Amino acid sequence: MEKKETKNDAEKNNKQDNKSTKSQKKENLNLVNSDKKITELENEISNLKDLYLRKQAEFENFRKRLEKEKDNFVKFANETIMKDVVNFLDNLERAINSSRKSKDFDNLLTGISMIENEILSIFDKKYNLKKFGENGENFDPSRHEAISIEEKEDLKNPEIVEVYQKGYCYNDRILRTAKVKVAQSKN
């Protein structure tokens, strides 16, 4: 009977060894799979860190480029208007040189008036800069500054009788009010 028990014990031990070996193999397989997964995740983290750093560098380069473009825009924003001003200066120089030769005041006055009209016309058309403040206009305190006042008979509305300095507006925004003398009714 002892032989049977020993045989049974041996079979039981053999079965337990098989279970134990299978369990160890399974654990080893799980460890290998876990190690592979850890390696994959570490690689993915490394790739994401690298991508993050590259995107951060790209963004910094973009920000610097945008700042440089903004600086250039501000620096050269008035280039078009400066080209027009240079043309006006050329015309003034021609008028002055011509009047030095001929000593003709009337021609100088005509030339300067033509240059003024050219300047006002180009500034109006290209830049929407308008001059205002004429004799006979109704006085508007938002557009005109009354430097002096005189009284007149039978005026319905205060009006401009003399302009000391013209006013200018740019895109409907007042740059400078016109400085004027205003007539108002005595009544």
From Swiss-Prot:
Any one GO molecular function term: protein-folding chaperone binding
Main localization (coarse): cytoplasm
One GO biological process term: protein folding
Entry keyword set: Chaperone, Cytoplasm, Stress response
Matching InterPro entries: GrpE, GrpE_coiled_coil, GrpE_head
Annotated spans, Disordered: 1-31
Subcellular location: Cytoplasm
Keyword flag Chaperone: yes
The keyword Chaperone is assigned to this record: yes
GO cellular component, one term: cytoplasm
Gene3D superfamilies, A to Z: 3.90.20.20, Head domain of nucleotide exchange factor GrpE
Similarity field: Belongs to the GrpE family.
NCBIfam families per UniProt: PRK14140.1
Function comment: Participates actively in the response to hyperosmotic and heat shock by preventing the aggregation of stress-denatured proteins, in association with DnaK and GrpE. It is the nucleotide exchange factor for DnaK and may function as a thermosensor. Unfolded proteins bind initially to DnaJ; upon interaction with the DnaJ-bound protein, DnaK hydrolyzes its bound ATP, resulting in the formation of a stable complex. GrpE releases ADP from DnaK; ATP binding to DnaK triggers the release of the substrate protein, thus completing the reaction cycle.
Subunit-level organization: Homodimer.
Protein's recorded name: Protein GrpE
Organism per entry: Borrelia garinii subsp. bavariensis (strain ATCC BAA-2496 / DSM 23469 / PBi)
